[in-house]
């Protein structure tokens, strides 16, 4: 077969009515005693291969007929157009070579429980639905980077191991670090992005983030990917404007590049895109509580707005909303205190509808040296561990703001999924560390 070009399912248009070789895996097979239809997976795409006894002969046809799911093969034949095919083409087989057998593949076409599928995640990735989800994830990742690069943001690779607490000390993964005491898996790259704005003005990072939250909800992972951005000379209002434009732009681009995959997922993106045609309402935390009380919720100032209450608010406003100016005691030390109400901070969470919940958290940062020391002391955090961070407030400090968005919740929203565990290749949850 070496004299015939070996092609990918991504390059089929160039080889219509030509002899080609396609290498891949048997995704499925069906047919009769005269012909078999193989779904051949290559490059994450499925190509239909037609195997006819009249062309192949009895012996080869019987080999084809008894192929098992996930057997790897090299198939030669003529590529023809077929508008009924998901990729628009079909391969008429004239030769086949088995590369690797597949015995007793555990994920058969029948229904399986989610616990079993998660335990077989290394194999479950091959299913049509999971193929589509991970392509959407890839498209989102591309759209995120494109958005920031087109607006002159610089990518900063922030450390995974850190000696500083970025969010809550109660959600840290800790490990001994030689003779230097404890190191922590990063909860955020934000503190390091703040250092970088003094060199580059507009920066972002995109990578894994770790939270040791003892939560088993459908919205939580202990390891997830977060994109974070930080901008010098930007206030709270600037930050909200950037976040809204970012979310609308990357969702639209991701959807446009994922239409076939969303079709596989039976996700109609029309309602999602409709949300993006309106401005996102901005309401104060205090106003949110007033609305919830009118709906019969027993909630007092200082209480958390849980996921159920978040969804009540998105339903009230008919789409995504920003909730801003949360109680100071409930938020991180680096958030700037609201000068109009010192009990609150200049922050906001973007809440997505459809059961998704918070997808962005952002704030204006405290730029004053004395104020941030007071906040560290309020949080009972060791000031000496933040010497380098405090230096940023001593040498040319400026107003600045930023935000972080969790990729998996965004993917769940775009794909219409009920759980974030399917939105990352190998999910890490409180009860799951394998495979």
From Swiss-Prot:
Which reactions is this enzyme annotated as catalysing? tRNA(Asn) + L-asparagine + ATP = L-asparaginyl-tRNA(Asn) + AMP + diphosphate + H(+)
Matching Pfam families: tRNA-synt_2 (PF00152), tRNA_anti-codon (PF01336)
- SUPFAM superfamilies, from UniProt? Class II aaRS and biotin synthetases (SSF55681), Nucleic acid-binding proteins (SSF50249)
Top enzyme class, one word, equals: ligase
Per UniProt, subcellular location reads as: Cytoplasm
Q: What is its main location?
A: cytoplasm
Any one annotated GO CC term: cytoplasm
Per the UniProt entry, what is one GO biological process?
A: asparaginyl-tRNA aminoacylation
Q: Which PROSITE patterns match?
A: AA_TRNA_LIGASE_II
Q: What is its EC number?
A: 6.1.1.22
Q: What domain of life?
A: Bacteria
- Fill in the subunit field for this protein: Homodimer.
Q: Which NCBIfam families match?
A: asnS, PRK03932.1
- Give the family per the record: Belongs to the class-II aminoacyl-tRNA synthetase family.
> Which protein, by its recorded name, is this?
Asparagine--tRNA ligase
- UniProt organism field: Leptospira borgpetersenii serovar Hardjo-bovis (strain JB197)
